[in-house]
């Protein structure tokens, strides 16, 4: 094979579709816009949810609920994720972040009881579920609310 014989892989380079270049091109005359109407004109920009002047669905339905601006969002960690640490390790949010188990701390870390804990650990977090608390203490570990 020589350099002048190189060809791109089949289907890797798509030919640009040139519209309005004669009827035999398949996209002449109306250029793929159909017949007359708002969407056939230039400069058309219908916003999402526009229903042609009919009251849109989001306005027909009633408002419901609210967003609590004081709500706290905790980063969730399950027990089986803590098995990566050695026995006797003190697990804090900083240690969890360094280990790549959590990305951001948000309002703190909450430990949940999903999975099985196999190590004896000292876990420091903002909140614990009852099942997580029981599992950690059952393995001889301890918890501390920070």
Swiss-Prot record:
SUPFAM superfamilies linked: Ribosomal proteins L15p and L18e
Superkingdom classification of source: Bacteria
Basic and acidic residues: bias regions: 1-13
Listed GO CC annotations: cytosolic large ribosomal subunit
Family affiliation: Belongs to the universal ribosomal protein uL15 family.
Primary role: Binds to the 23S rRNA.
Subunit structure: Part of the 50S ribosomal subunit.
Protein name stated in the entry: Large ribosomal subunit protein uL15
Organism: Streptococcus thermophilus (strain ATCC BAA-491 / LMD-9)
Lineage, opening ranks: Bacteria, Bacillati, Bacillota, Bacilli, Lactobacillales
Underlying gene: rplO
